[in-house]
Amino acid sequence: MKIAVLGAAGGIGQALALLLKLQLPAGSELSLYDIAPVTPGVAADVSHIPTAVKIQGFAGEDPIPALENADVVLISAGVARKPGMDRSDLFNINAGIVKNLIEKVAKTCPKACVGIITNPVNTTVAIAAEVLKKAGVYDKRKLFGVTTLDVLRSETFVAELKGLNVSRIAVPVIGGHSGVTILPLLSQVQYTEWKEDEIAPLTKRIQNAGTEVVEAKAGGGSATLSMAQAAARFALSLVQGLSGETVVECTYVEGDGKYARFFAQPVRLGKEGVEEILPVGTLSAFEQKALEDMLPTLRADIELGEKFVNN
């Protein structure tokens, strides 16, 4: 199976390349692309790690050589958030980058599963869908917004707060991938009892965790290492699914439109990408209200992406 990483010279991309070289199944191929001339060097560097994963690096304006015969494409290209910016400030730059790359995906590997990491994910996934649709190759089972970092953060913070073994914690996170659209379903976490005054602050911390990192890095970037681990976890689950195993991950996909055209929720991954979108389950009163409150924001984010391509 061939996995292409677009944006492989960036903070997320380099760490993601390392994690995939270490963890992809033997016999996999890893293809790294970035506009930056350092990219073949990143591939050379990572290639010295002794695992049975072949790796190649490509630089320059044209991602097509990196995309040929790809089964999975992960897009992390774009600019990172700096203090004072929110994810929507990234839109003006990253929207064009994602559009251009997806046009090349549509031409070169239209049947590949595509995972969008580039923020604002709520919007960039809609851009990708519209570009693929215009090219006549859109298959909603094969397009994903990678929201796994919200799950990782939720698992970490719940374990810390409750003094639990983090490996036993699973937290479904639904909605979108910015601010109020991130909704961890804490009421569904096993082995935990919640006090009234714990839920709202913890939810807010999960929603604002990206900003926490941006501020802590003091202008030196945004969450890259934890994001790379999240993307690696998602990519490895996707590869398992494509290989015929049953795996469930929360991810931002086009479903039945019950809440919004794109919505993050638990998804069973399989040989065609999305095998089945699973129900969100029973929500607490707090979660139900948070869900209703976020929908106008989420729908507006999606519409922004659709209009970017169609107007």
Curated annotation (Swiss-Prot):
The UniProt record gives the binding positions of substrate as 81, 87, 119, 153
The protein's enzyme class: oxidoreductase
EC number(s): the record gives 1.1.1.37
Q: Which InterPro entries match?
A: L-lactate/malate_DH (IPR001557), Lactate/malate_DH_C (IPR022383), Lactate/malate_DH_N (IPR001236), Lactate_DH/Glyco_Ohase_4_C (IPR015955), Malate_DH_AS (IPR001252), Malate_DH_type1 (IPR010097), Malate_DH_type1_bac (IPR023958), NAD(P)-bd_dom_sf (IPR036291)
Do you know which NCBIfam families this protein is assigned to? MDH_euk_gproteo
Q: How does it assemble?
A: Homodimer.
Q: What is this protein called?
A: Malate dehydrogenase
Q: What is the lineage of its organism?
A: Bacteria, Pseudomonadati, Pseudomonadota, Gammaproteobacteria, Pasteurellales
